[in-house]
A protein has these predicted regions:
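Exposed, interaction-prone assembly regions rather than primary DNA-binding/catalytic cores
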Residues: 5, 160, 180-181
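Non-catalytic C-terminal interaction segments of nucleic acid-processing enzymes
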Residues: 47-51, 63-84, 243-277
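Beta-rich nucleic-acid/ligand-interaction surfaces
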Residues: 73, 172-184
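Acidic-basic catalytic patches of nuclease active cores, encompassing PD-(D/E)XK
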Residues: 85, 125-173
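A short, polar/proline- and glycine-enriched secondary-structure boundary/capping micro-motif
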Residues: 119-122, 141, 202-205
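Active-site beta-strand-loop-beta-strand hairpin of nuclease catalytic cores
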Residues: 179-191, 217-218
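Catalytic cores of nucleic-acid endonucleases
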Residues: 195-254
């Protein structure tokens, strides 16, 4: 059972990768900038508010871009039917997942979710089912695990930066996911990748395996590249200073990438902005 579940998770996550590749291919062939807009909106749609939802919400997004790309229909495969046996359900306030209301589990969720719930004293959210016989969908587990959960930190950092510098200058998943976030100014661009790995060693090895440094070093000389360690990883890792472990290893591989914690990122971006202006 376990092996089959893991295989299904991998298959589900590949659905997102296939969508990414289709969007890149279509954009390369057509140059239609609506595809870039579509990809960013679809990726940001996979968030805590849309873990469990009505099919109408999904169809609304599909309809918005149905004349832009045939690949938009693929997101229908990212969700599966869910049977809500109770009219009153509870969702995790961090990731949006349906919580088991077994009193012994105390509505617990992932370690990341519990970190932010404890820090901010967040309580589970009530999710009431209407009596109209409406059906609901939930995100498939592989997409929840490999896209929604890492996206929690990406979206949080994006919203914070956009709140400071404006949504017209701060882009989410720019250039069809070349990076997670970019901050654009007259004389340069700050590119940001947020990496949410349990182990700093696994993070670096994955970057090497995926040849991510080629992408990071391909930016212009007056651009900046930041690799950001989410707050919960930096503060809960027990094997040493997470950021320093990654930083030391990456310095052996490239001098283009700056490794910072989430807290440090905002000062770094602010310093660069002040220099540019």
């Amino acid at each position: 059972w376990y092996e089959n579940s893991i295989q299904n998770d991998d298959v589900n996550q590949n659905l997102v990768k296939e969508f990414l590749l289709e969007c890149r291919k279509e954009y390369k062939e057509t140059g239609n900038k609506k595809i870039i807009e579509m990809y960013s909106e679809v990726r940001s749609f996979i968030n805590a508010s849309n873990y469990c939802l009505s099919p109408n919400r999904i169809m609304s997004l599909v309809g918005k871009y149905s004349n832009t790309s045939y690949s938009i229909a693929e997101i229908l495969e990212w969700y599966e039917n869910v049977n809500l046996l109770s009219e009153e359900n509870y969702l995790c306030p961090v990731c949006g997942k349906l919580l088991d209301n077994d009193i012994l589990k105390e509505f617990r969720c992932t370690d990341m979710c519990m970190y932010y719930r404890d820090k901010e004293s967040l309580l589970p959210k009530k999710f009431n089912v209407d009596n109209s016989g409406s059906k609901y969908k939930k995100l498939k587990r592989g997409i929840y695990t490999y896209t929604l959960l890492p996206g929690v930190s990406e979206l949080r950092i994006y919203d914070q930066l956009a709140g400071c510098y404006g949504y017209e200058k701060v882009l989410l998943y720019p250039e069809i996911d070349k990076f997670d976030i970019s901050v654009i100014f007259d004389t340069g661009v700050i590119y940001i990748d947020v990496k949410d790995f349990a182990s700093p060693h696994d993070l670096v090895e994955t970057l090497i395996k995926n040849q991510s440094f080629i992408k990071m070093e391909s930016v212009r000389d007056n651009d900046y590249v930041y690799l950001v360690i989410p707050e919960h990883r930096q503060n809960t890792y027990k094997g040493g200073n997470y950021r320093n472990i990654v930083k030391k290893r990456i310095l052996q591989l490239t001098n283009k990438v700056r490794v910072v914690s989430e807290d440090e990122l905002h000062k770094e971006v602010g310093d660069i902005v002040n220099e540019l202006y």
